[in-house]
Amino acid sequence: MLEEAQKVIDKIRELTDEVILFHSASGKDSIVLCDMLSKSFRKVVCVYMYVVKGMESQEMYMRYAKTKYPNVTFMQVPHYAWYSYAKYGYMGCVPRPQMKKYTLAELTDIARGKTGIEWAFFGFKQSDSLNRRVMLRTYEDEAINYKTKKVYPLSKYKNRDCMEYIKKMSLIHPETTENCNKTQSSGVAISDLDYLLFLRSRFPQDLKLIINEYPLVERLLYEYDFNQTQPTK
């Protein structure tokens, strides 16, 4: 299962015994890669990018990984979207016009500087979007960029492949909303109504954390609740 992904990982293992993994905490791709990398490398530093820090719905996944894999550690940094949100006052957060915006590439370099680790792994798949498909197909094995030292082992796989691996290996199930079958963006989708309803039902303290930082999010729920009381036309 995921044999091509393992071959990609094995190639990098010949070059280093420690890697960075950009880990979304509750996402299926991250759960799969964390399991695979922990078995191949001496040290795996997972970088979790948050939009709201301290959400239990995400922290529980990080605790799971640290407990299950002794060679896995986590560092948390603001998500690149957080800098943009802060700069422009998205969803009512306190605007910080002087805030510098960061790209994922820049955050990767910051993580490298803090850890001293060069090779970075990501859960990107060609099936995610056209842009990712075009990008990934330019790399060796459609997965390895030796120039930037970035690796995408799941490039050729689909969501169902990751879910099958999770089931077969009896890993923790990724976060899924109650209103749909899609897995969410692990604490990033703060304006997604399904995600907000999921938090209200399962992790109300996390919802409070989001509203404290992005107060206009509460209006989305207010409008939803109001519409639920209106007669169907």
Language-model-detected regions and their locations in the chain:
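Nucleotide-activated chemistry modules centered on ATP-dependent adenylation/adenylyltransferase
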Residues: M1-K233
